[in-house]
């Protein structure tokens, strides 16, 4: 209950933010009621619009929903995938003031130049290209002013509401909503501590070094030019790994480069349970020297050996068309599972398993459009619902990992059609 009472501790700024949030949600509720009167259920749309309007925490919450199809209904997951984390840029004069305050002295004491126009502007931070006093090309990630107090007010309100839902909404007392919000709170507060992101980058780099891996790199962290609120990193030049035409400028064998990237990602996951949890076309590059570049480590994941073992059993069942293996894998992932009827669970999974098998087979036959977000989200949500009905609690990392693997499979079918990522998964473990 400590978190409940902590959620009531807000200052004037927090109260103002909560009033603003209440106004936005009230406005969207009125629009929703009008829609319902006309026979249209637009709750996911109105919620997404409210999240985008409020920015910061709510956009991150939308992204959490979008990335966790095993936890949320399909219509919300699909709508939140449209949640745009693009906001009006902070004026350069404000960026300059923040950097000078964080590093001390004048901007020119630390950088030869900083590009006034940002590379990217999101709800939590803004990114500018720059050149260090030593002539090195870097990017500077700068937190938006007052973001920490905004997040605190938002998170307190969200947690307070989640506790009320669990206490008074029928059927939600055992849903674990408040626990999930509490984990979200921990995660997002870590994301605004750029020391944590710097640590994540260097941890991934240590994994690469421990494997003797020279095919991949992460950007160098310039600790002397970084604080909790600004992060200065080596600037990478190259092409997104999914842009086959562009990467041919840097790699004579794009197929091998892609399989190298997959091998590295799988191997760091299997060796230590640590993985980059947001690998997409924008965060995975082929650099000018032909190596693979992993960027943006604001979101990482960690899984236990038990979850990894369960995931491998699950994928084996998927590749062999055996629901009993899939059931065994899901049971293995839940350390609290006791007395689960494996045969009944396997039988219950048959329908949803056939849907996933059909999707995977279509992708393997070259029908890349079959890997549709809406269908995949619905399938993963069904897995979760059936698991809950059978007394299982599927870890949140499961949906994230399965979705990542299936999207990797889509990239593979574009550039390396002879490879079956699910069937050949062991080949990517070094």
Which role fits each region the language model picked out?
Residues 282-286:
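Hydrophobic residue at the +6 position relative to the catalytic HRD Asp in the kinase catalytic loop
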Residues 12-15, 39-41, 236-257, 287-430:
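Helix-rich C-lobe and terminal helical cap/extension of kinase-like folds
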Residues 129, 136-144:
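Glycine-rich ATP phosphate-binding loop
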Residues 39-47, 68, 79-86, 141-147, ...:
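Short hinge/gating elements
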